[in-house]
């Protein structure tokens, strides 16, 4: 299967049934190829037969559970299914209700993987509340984290599979469903976790071969080709099948469902000067609350200091487990902002939802499309709410600075590659990361 790049071809010259000249206009990823599809009045799906992919591309925005009730899902075979729908469309509810109930009826087990501990804990609490409420009374917060069996699901965060014991645990079981929620994070997190690709493939190869593999995301662009590739690798060799009229059925290994997106509730505002937007927040009415995604811990602490401890709280991946642990757990449990401003790093891009009618402002110091969609999605809207979305547009100088950092990093990678290729003998402490880590 050609999963990396597809080509859109323009026919320049044709004679009879023969094409004499073809011009390659653009390389296309699978996601771009799907975007290029034209509406078809006769059917809502399109097969890419050479790639064994079927795309359903005409679903209106609605709750996932309405589109995939139990009677439809029961007809699914042990193949791959990608569900692309924006945040707030009930993907997690579909998992904890529809799929969980199916598993209980069939006396089967499902494996549920998420990229964030916060999202894992959210799933565990919801499944426990529905199917084993006694666990919520018996277990402490740490106990909930260590427990993995909740009703019909085994629930893990992807980071836990750095442990060989966790890998052995899933290899010893037979799963009816393997569900990867927020699956885009397997690529997005690779910048700070070099094992995400290995974990992704390991989970599907070891636990997913004989299961229905479900991938959930609102931002599939960075992961779709990898999903298609691994689906080809783990799918058994095709056995021709025929319909009732004797026509061969298409060899579909991966089915993609794309739901329409609706961001009509968003009022976008772009800015470059950080001080300007800070001034606006300092004068924001006390009746409104704001969610601010900063670039770094340093920036987050600066914003907290300028807005004041009485109005703002800063959380990151570290202090949510230490001095901010109680506040973070309250946020997970009640999904409300305690102070006027919640300042966070990107650790909260998935897994934490805020159902707060007073939250009217979201500020992003991130401009990648995946970041914008996921961070905006932490605010869950109801009715006719309008959200002001402030997005920083980097200056030319800032962009040049980032380009310089990338060029320096690329040069360092090249030097390390040459060192390894030439097998230069050196002390162990001089080896490049990750071949050496200073243990303390």
Report each predicted region and the residues it spans.
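N-terminal helicase ATP-binding lobe
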Residues: 1-216, 220-341, 347-352, 356-372, ...
């Amino acid at each position: 299967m050609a999963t990396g790049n597809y080509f859109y071809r323009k026919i320049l010259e044709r004679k009879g049934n023969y094409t004499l000249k073809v011009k390659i206009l653009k390389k296309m990823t699978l996601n771009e190829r799907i975007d290029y599809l034209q509406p078809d009045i006769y059917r809502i799906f399109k097969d890419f037969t050479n790639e064994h992919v079927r795309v359903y591309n005409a679903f209106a925005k609605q709750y996932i559970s309405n589109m995939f009730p139990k009677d439809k899902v029961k007809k699914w075979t042990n193949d791959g299914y990608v569900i692309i729908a924006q945040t707030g469309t009930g993907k997690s509810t579909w998992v904890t209700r529809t799929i969980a109930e199916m598993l209980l009826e069939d006396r089967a087990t499902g494996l549920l993987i998420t990229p964030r501990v916060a999202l894992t804990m959210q799933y565990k609490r919801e499944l426990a509340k529905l199917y084993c409420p006694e666990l919520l009374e018996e277990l402490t917060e740490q106990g909930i984290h260590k427990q993995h069996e909740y009703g019909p699901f085994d629930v893990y965060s992807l980071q836990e599979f750095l442990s060989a014991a966790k890998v052995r645990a899933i290899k010893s079981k037979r799963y009816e469903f393997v569900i990867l929620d927020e699956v885009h994070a397997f690529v997005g997190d690779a910048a700070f976790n070099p094992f995400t690709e290995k974990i992704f493939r390991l989970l599907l190869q070891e636990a997913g071969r004989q299961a229905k593999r479900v991938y959930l995301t609102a931002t599939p662009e960075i992961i779709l080709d990898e999903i298609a590739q691994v689906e080809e690798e783990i799918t058994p060799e095709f056995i021709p099948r025929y319909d009732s009229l004797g026509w061969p059925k298409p060899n579909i290994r991966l089915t993609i469902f794309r739901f329409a997106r609706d961001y009509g509730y968003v009022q976008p505002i772009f800015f470059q000067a950080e001080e300007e937007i800070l001034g606006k927040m300092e004068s924001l009415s006390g009746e409104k609350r704001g969610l601010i995604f900063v670039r770094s811990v340093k920036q987050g602490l600066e914003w907290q200091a300028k807005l004041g401890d009485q109005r703002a709280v800063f959380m990151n991946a570290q202090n949510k487990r230490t001095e901010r642990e109680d506040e973070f757990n309250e946020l997970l449990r009640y999904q409300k902002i305690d102070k006027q401003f919640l300042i966070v790093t990107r650790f909260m891009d998935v897994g934490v939802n805020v159902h707060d009618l007073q939250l009217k402002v979201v500020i992003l110091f991130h401009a990648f499309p995946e970041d914008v969609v996921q961070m905006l999605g932490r605010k869950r809207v109801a009715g006719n709410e309008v959200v002001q979305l402030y997005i920083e547009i980097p200056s030319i100088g800032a962009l040049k600075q980032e380009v310089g950092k990338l060029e320096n990093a690329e040069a360092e990678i090249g030097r390390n590659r040459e060192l390894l290729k030439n097998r230069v003998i050196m002390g162990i402490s001089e080896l490049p990361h990750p071949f050496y880590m200073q243990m303390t």
